[in-house]
Every structure is written in structure tokens, then in C-alpha cells.
Amino acid sequence: MSLLNCENSCGSSQSESDCCVAMASSCSAATKDDSVGGTASTGNLSSSFMEEIQGYDVEFDPPLESKYECPICLMALREAVQTPCGHRFCKACIIKSIRDAGHKCPVDNEILLENQLFPDNFAKREILSLMVKCPNEGCLHKMELRHLEDHQAHCEFALVDCPQCQRPFQKFHINIHILKDCPRRQVSCDNCAALVAFEDKEIHDQNCPLANVICEYCNTILIREQMPNHYDLDCPTAPIPCTFSTFGCHEKMQRNHLARHLQENTQSHMRMLAQAVHSLSLIPDSGYVSEVRNFQETIHQLEGRLVRQDHQIRELTAKMETQSTYVSELKRTIRTLEDKVAEIEAQQCNGIYIWKIGNFGMHLKCQEEEKPVVIHSPGFYTGKPGYKLCMRLHLQLPTAQRCANYISLFVHTMQGEYDSHLPWPFQGTIRLTILDQSEAPVRQNHEEIMDAKPDLLAFQRPTIPRNPKGFGYVTFMHLEALRQRTFIKDDTLLVRCEVSTRFDMGSLRREGFQPRSTDSGV
């Protein structure tokens, strides 16, 4: 407010200058501690800043007062600064002057250093509040200087470069120019429908393969790509050499006159032909005969080799088909053995199965990308005899309601070898655990225990290889909790399932199983 009062109280340019000097002295004292920061900031100005347009080169309405003009560039002050001697300059102008002309004020030659300059925010506000005219030709808008840049960004009279010919046009006219006037606008060829630039269309028309052209000899109208064949084969008036030109006839005539020429010059043509044959007969032929004989022998050898190779290819094809059939049988046998081994391994679990889920980082990435992740474990038995079960792990998507970013874990019954001898529905206790793989003495596994509910479809005897109904936890564990400890090691997650079955002994006896005696002597 002191600066505002100082400006308003000065009635002349001299008093204004005196006021500014006083203000500069007070500001210099008040900002003494900040002069180092100001010096560093001023000293680090880039060369690109120094080369920018200094003052505001715009038309003011009313005209700009002289007190807002930079004495160096004679334009409106941009980023106005004051000197201790009370003069105002554009920041870029005065810094350039100090660096080029020496440390002195351009107006009164007083000693002036860069760190003595200070921003004139009052003048800056005043100048930005002045009314200016839009510099674009044809635009009548007036606005405060502070709004000029925003106006020019949307002004319909601003110049923009045509994206096709790169010439500048006013924004409101650019669309019409692009569609109707631009020499590089795309137009379609009337003959081949190809898109070409308007200024290149004349050249294209002169070379278009589908353009209609007139034969220069017979005036027939054809498309350009047909013309060479027309000249060589069909044109009746095209000049062609005599058929006997190879034998010495140098006459040329129109194609429709060739028959008459051959008829009228039969004797001379025969003499030329006889002379050519006679000259050939004088050439020794022993070399040619031997060469032809060599070619014949080579051809005979190649034909024999071709026949042998054809037989070999047929034999190899038959062997390959036999081997392919054998390999297919071996693959089926391997799959059968693998299934049997997996079944035997599943029977050895005795109700405790540890499921190793590899490449778990890939599954987490799919979950983050909102791709469904559902994984089933191999089957395992609760004992021998026992029920066959498997686990299902589901990574809930971030957008799922009430269970977003949770691990869901379920148990499914499967068709097993002993199903006909076991009591149904399944009864027992299931303990699901995600194992802590840290090296700590006491590991903090994440565990849940559930009891089977015989009335649910999930525990009835399955009628297909895997019961579609499962039993477990939709919100077994949050993914954030999974990352807090070492549940994932070597990109592998370990899930443990421990099953304790409760058999109805009467049912077991009816199914043909007898309970093992506790007597150690048996």
C-alpha cells in the first residue's frame, strides 16, 4: 500500500522519480538479506530468455503512457523492474544492457548491478490492466493485457499453418482452405480413384494407367496400360519391321501392309533365307554335336536321379506316416501313465496337500489389469481309501463389490477311485492355510478352519469329474496382507489343505470296509 500511495501522491514526472528513488532505498534496505538469492536467480538467466522479445509490442487503447515505456526497447514494460535511481526497465532489457554495455543505468549512467534490481509489481499490475487491441488483422476485440494471450489462443482471426501446405491462414478460414483452396488437398482421380494432391493431379493424369488415350497411329481409344500391347500386337497402322528382318530385309511398313509385302517379295525373302542357311552349313558342327550329346547325357542322368529321388520320397513319406502314428500312440500312453502317476501321488497325501502356485507375480499382474484369475489345484485324496478333493484360488478384481482385491479360496469334491465305497455326503473338517515362507523361527501362517455342511451341494457325491459347487472363503485374505510378509518366495505361493474326515462306521461296514483294530497284536 505504501507503493500505491507513493504513485498517486506524485503529481509530476520529477516527483514520481524522487518517490521511486525513496522507495528503491527503502526496498533495498528491506530486502538486503534476499539480495544473494536475487543475484543467483538473475545470474542464471538462460540465453534463450535474453533473446526473447523484451517489451509488449501491442497497440494500447488509449495509447500507452510514457511512464510505462521501457527506455531501452521503447515498448510497454514486460516484467518491470526498478533501479535504485528510480528508473523502470523490462527485466530482460536492463539485464542485457548491464551485461553488454557495463554496470550502469542507461538513463543517468549511475552505477548499477544486477542484484540491485527489484521487481516493480505495482507497474506490472497497472500495465497488465491496460486495454489493448487484438493484433490479429480483422479482429475488433479489446481486452486487458493480461487476457491477451488467452484471447489469441482462441481468436478466430489468428494465423495458423495449414497442415497440408504449411501456409498461414486465419483460423476461421482454415477449414474452407483445407477443403476447397489448398493446393495439397486430396482429390480423387476420375479414372483410377487414387487419392493425389490437387497440384499433382495434372502430372498423375499424364501417367495414370487407367486414363483413356488415343493411339497415335490408328486413333483407337484405349486405357494407357493397354497401349503397349496394342502397339506390339494389334494396331493395324503401327510401323513394324518385315518378318524376314533377321535374314536381311530392312523394310518397314504398317501392320496391315505386311501381308502384301510378304507376297510381293517372296523371291527376295527366299534368297535371303537360302543365303542364311548356306552360311550356317559352312560353320563346323563337330563342336555343337558333341555339346548337344553332352547335354543329352546330362539330361538322361538327371531324369534317372529324379526317378530314384521320387521313390525315396515316397518311402520316406510312408515311414513318416508310420512314425507319426507310433508317436501319437506313445503320447497317448504317456498321458495315461501321467494320469496314473498323478492319481497315485494324490492318494499318498493322506489328507494333507501343499499346492505350489508358480509364476504368481504374473497372476497378480493380470489381476491388476482386471483380467480374471481362477486357478485349480491338482486333485488329492484324504486317505486310502478317501475322498478326492481339489482347491480353487480366485484373485478378486479391484472392481469387485465387497471383495475387491481379496484372495478367494474354495474346496471342490471330485470323482475318485473309492467314491462307491464311501459314505456321502462328505463330512469332516478342512483347514486351509497360506504358508509364511520366511526364515523366522516362528512363522505367521494365514489359516482358516471350516466344517463340512452335509446339506450343501458342494459335499454331495459328484456326478461329473469336478463338482462345480465349491465351499470356502470369498474373502480368505487381502492382497495387501499378502505383500506384508514373505508369503511369496521365488515367485511361488504355497497353499496347504489339511482334511480330517468323519466316517459313519455303520455306513463303512455297509460299503464293505472294516475298521482297523487298535489291538497291537493284530
Swiss-Prot record:
Sumoylated on Lys-124, Lys-142 and Lys-453 with SUMO1. Polyubiquitinated on Lys-124 by TRAF3IP2; after cell stimulation with IL17A. Polyubiquitinated on Lys-124; after cell stimulation with IL1B or TGFB. This ligand-induced cell stimulation leads to dimerization/oligomerization of TRAF6 molecules, followed by auto-ubiquitination which involves UBE2N and UBE2V1 and leads to TRAF6 activation. This 'Lys-63' site-specific poly-ubiquitination appears to be associated with the activation of signaling molecules. Deubiquitinated by USP10 in a TANK-dependent manner, leading to the negative regulation of NF-kappa-B signaling upon DNA damage. One of its GO terms (molecular function) is identical protein binding. GO terms for cellular component: CD40 receptor complex; cell cortex; cytoplasmic side of plasma membrane; cytosol; glutamatergic synapse; lipid droplet; nucleus; perinuclear region of cytoplasm. A zinc finger (TRAF-type) spans 150-202, 203-259. There is a cross-link at K124, K319 (Glycyl lysine isopeptide (Lys-Gly) (interchain with G-Cter in ubiquitin)). Its main location: cytoplasm. It catalyses: S-ubiquitinyl-[E2 ubiquitin-conjugating enzyme]-L-cysteine + [acceptor protein]-L-lysine = [E2 ubiquitin-conjugating enzyme]-L-cysteine + N(6)-ubiquitinyl-[acceptor protein]-L-lysine. Its EC number is 2.3.2.27. Residues 350-499 form the MATH domain. Residues 288-348 form a coiled coil. It is an enzyme of class 2 (transferase). Residues 355-522 are annotated as: Interaction with TANK. InterPro entries: MATH/TRAF_dom, TNF_rcpt-assoc_TRAF_met, TRAF-like, TRAF1-6_MATH_dom, TRAF6_MATH, TRAF6_RING-HC, TRAF6_Z2, Znf_RING. The keyword Isomerase does not apply. A zinc finger (RING-type) spans 70-109. Residues 1-354 are annotated as: Interaction with TAX1BP1. It comes from the Eukaryota. There is a cross-link at K124, K142, K453 (Glycyl lysine isopeptide (Lys-Gly) (interchain with G-Cter in SUMO)). Belongs to the TNF receptor-associated factor family. A subfamily. E3 ubiquitin ligase that, together with UBE2N and UBE2V1, mediates the synthesis of 'Lys-63'-linked-polyubiquitin chains conjugated to proteins, such as ECSIT, IKBKG, IRAK1, AKT1 and AKT2. Also mediates ubiquitination of free/unanchored polyubiquitin chain that leads to MAP3K7 activation. Leads to the activation of NF-kappa-B and JUN. Seems to also play a role in dendritic cells (DCs) maturation and/or activation. Represses c-Myb-mediated transactivation, in B-lymphocytes. The coiled coil domain mediates homo- and hetero-oligomerization. Homotrimer. Homooligomer. N-terminal region is dimeric while C-terminal region is trimeric; maybe providing a mode of oligomerization. Upon IL1B treatment, forms a complex with PELI1, IRAK1, IRAK4 and MYD88; this complex recruits MAP3K7/TAK1, TAB1 and TAB2 to mediate NF-kappa-B activation. Direct binding of SMAD6 to PELI1 prevents the complex formation and hence negatively regulates IL1R-TLR signaling and eventually NF-kappa-B-mediated gene expression. Binds to TNFRSF5/CD40 and TNFRSF11A/RANK. This is TNF receptor-associated factor 6. The lineage of its organism: Eukaryota, Metazoa, Chordata, Craniata, Vertebrata. The gene is TRAF6.
